[in-house]
Amino acid sequence: MNNQNNGNPVRNSGVSRRSLLQSGATTAAIALAGGLSFPAAAQVSASTSADKISGRRKLGQLEVSSLGLGVQNMSRTYQTTIPSRPEMHRIIRTAYEHGLTFFDAAEAYGPHEVERILGEAIAPFRNQVVITSKFGWDIDLETGERRPGLVSQPKRIKQAVEGMLKRLKTDHIDLLYQHRVDPTVPIEDVAGAIKDLKAEGKVLHWGLSEMGLKTLRRAHAELPVTAVQNEYSMLWRGPEAEVIPLCEELGIGFVPWSPLGVGFLTGAIDAKTRFAQGDIRGIETRFSQENLPNNLALVELVKSWAVRKQATPARIALAWLMAQKPWIVPIPGTTQMAHMLDNIGAAEVNFTPGEIAELNKALTSIHVQGVRLPPNVLAFSGVEAAEKS
């Protein structure tokens, strides 16, 4: 991979760099925050080839492959380059050929263009896969212009879905998420719009992302929620405290975004790393000069397990997530074929109960320092919807 980003090198001590998480403006960073994910780097001598993904998982009543593929960066990388469209189609189709049937998109990705790329790629086998999209950010329905704030009025949700269906070249969306909770709109009203769309056959299941706990309960009481999509990885274990237990209580599946810790868990970041201008990780305190040396202990732990299990660090990080609950389905994203194949190989990494207990204990002993997102992005997480009057 090319380490250059618009002439500004991002150096990493001899380690092949993973895709940069770029965002040219604050609004773009916020809008994209629901799907920050990186491709896997082959950093040990494990093969990047993969057989078909073994096993299926249930998100509520929705059956999917044990891993998914996030397609967020397939229209425009964070280095601002435009990936080869035919190559993106090839990656998606190869993933399907290897048994991956769960593809994650959103209207905010692109905006709009990622949905078009996914729709083009899956057209030959649309009814054999599960596709997701998301609404909620203030995206112009026609131009895709990204504006500040959120919008989840029922009429707007329905209009957004019509656009999604056209771009995805389909007559239904298997799983539709509210990308972030709009604090001005009762979640009961949002659920009502989804009910109408389900009655029309345009949406089959629904979910929420980064919502408040009370909102999740209210939403599920109004219309059963299939899945929650939140950030979750070895680097950010916050959902373990309340969100995952609530999902277990309610029978809701869990889909971790950024399952590789914005690339950190692959070994792509070390003490010598210098982020390019605009890379959101450059303003994340987890990777500041003060906190990074402490947090690198986590990477060393993952690398040690990679050697022990004869896998790549990416596979260890993903397999660890899948070992936490049988209804957790990570969605690592990539624009590189080899990285996609490496990622799906995580399905073949198994931990014994003793191993997972040992690894969890070691992880707990490492206290990650710093906040997971910049404050202006984090402000959209854990939000409660307005009460229904």
Residue ranges and their predicted role:
Residues 1-15:
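N-terminal secretory signal peptides
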Residues 105-120:
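Glycine-rich, proline-tolerant flexible connector loops at the mouths of alpha/beta enzymes
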Residues 182-361, 366, 380-386:
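Beta/alpha (TIM)-barrel catalytic core signal, keyed to glycine-rich beta->alpha loops juxtaposed to Asp/Glu
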Residues 36-68, 81:
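C-terminal segment of N-terminal export signals and the immediately downstream linker at the start
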Residues 64-68, 102, 128-132, 172-175, ...:
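Structural preference for beta-strand elements that scaffold enzyme active sites
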Residues 14-19, 29-47:
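N-terminal twin-arginine translocation
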Residues 73-85, 145-155:
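Active-site mouth loops of central-metabolism enzymes
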